């Protein structure tokens, strides 16, 4: 829908036909783009599996590729965090857009006794969120994209419970239109590292809480993820922030910020399975990605017997 609106605006500006095009289609359309000799570069956003498919197929046909894949974004909470503000940022990150965005925070990693302080504040604020039509005033969590997505998200919640987690907030039966594809904000605590809800991208309003003993354990846990898109740390310690940003294997880091996406003049930068390619989206990387460079060496013999060289 967003793309459709953007292209309607572009049409209203009087751009010549064919300068930009919106093409909808399935695998045949995608393969045609990836293989066409008339297309020099491909930029993709989607799941890790499809990102790898796009990257490998387009690269095999000599194209420049940037492929943004999946994510499992961790939000690390230290005991000295300002819990009220931390809870607000976590809620916005995890449940905004019903968790259906690559920068959604989906795992809280609490150090020491931080969960004891955070839990009552976070649970109280989450319970106040209203589920319903996202266009209605006062609604905090809208629908997920389809019935199939709803079923998939609910199955992850059940799997989390089967793997030993408990529900701090149960969003399986939200008070919303039963004909819609709704899942309420859900918080699973007691999640064990290595389980499905701890490792896999759910892409819904489900938040997993993992408790660890030390800062060392927290950093190690984040770095075991196959993804490296974004992460946040909540603390008032500058020393902890410096260590975290130096040691964590993630492309975008937020400090007391729930959604660690930078403004667009900085690169949008994932690592590991979150990104395939050399030049990232946004910033100077994006300019370089869509630029072909030439270096010209020339000389003019009228400047002297051997000429004078110029490099442009």
List where the protein language model places each region:
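Conserved C-terminal structural/oligomerization subdomain of aldehyde/semialdehyde dehydrogenase
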Residues: 15, 39, 76, 130, ...
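Short alpha-helical
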Residues: 1, 27-29, 48-50, 60, ...
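Active-site phosphate-binding strand-loop segment of PLP-dependent enzymes
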Residues: 19-50
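Short amphipathic alpha-helical segments
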Residues: 4-5, 34-35, 53-57, 120-121, ...
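ALDH superfamily catalytic-core signature
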Residues: 16-19, 41, 48-192, 215, ...
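PLP-dependent aminotransferase-like
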Residues: 1-30
């Amino acid at each position: 829908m967003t793309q459709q609106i953007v292209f309607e605006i572009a049409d209203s500006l009087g751009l010549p036909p064919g300068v930009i095009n919106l093409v909808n289609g399935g695998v045949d359309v995608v393969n045609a783009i990836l293989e066409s000799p008339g297309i020099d570069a491909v930029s993709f956003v989607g799941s890790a599996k499809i990102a790898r498919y796009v990257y490998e197929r387009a690269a095999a046909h000599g194209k420049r590729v940037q492929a943004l894949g999946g994510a499992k974004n961790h939000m690390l909470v230290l005991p000295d965090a300002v819990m009220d503000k931390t809870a607000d940022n976590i809620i916005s990150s995890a449940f905004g857009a019903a968790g259906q965005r690559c920068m959604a925070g989906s795992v809280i990693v609490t150090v020491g006794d931080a969960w004891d302080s955070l839990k009552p504040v976070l649970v109280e604020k989450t319970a106040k969120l209203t589920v319903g039509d996202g266009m209605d005033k006062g609604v905090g969590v809208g629908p997920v994209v389809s019935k199939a997505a709803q079923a998939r998200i609910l199955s992850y919640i059940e799997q989390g419970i089967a793997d030993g987690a408990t529900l701090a907030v149960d969003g399986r039966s939200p008070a919303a239109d039963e004909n819609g594809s709704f899942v309420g904000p859900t918080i699973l605590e007691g999640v064990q590292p290595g389980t499905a809800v701890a490792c896999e991208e759910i892409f819904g309003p489900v938040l997993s809480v993992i408790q660890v003993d030390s800062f060392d354990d927290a950093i190690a846990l984040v770095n075991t993820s196959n993804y490296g898109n974004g992460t946040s740390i909540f603390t008032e310690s500058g020393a902890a922030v410096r260590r975290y940003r130096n040691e964590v294997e993630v492309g975008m880091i937020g400090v007391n910020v729930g959604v660690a996406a930078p403004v667009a003049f900085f690169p949008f930068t994932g690592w590991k399975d979150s990104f395939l390619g050399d030049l990232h989206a946004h910033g100077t990387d994006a300019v370089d990605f869509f630029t072909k460079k030439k270096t010209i060496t020339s000389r003019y013999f009228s400047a002297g017997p051997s000429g004078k060289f110029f490099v442009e």
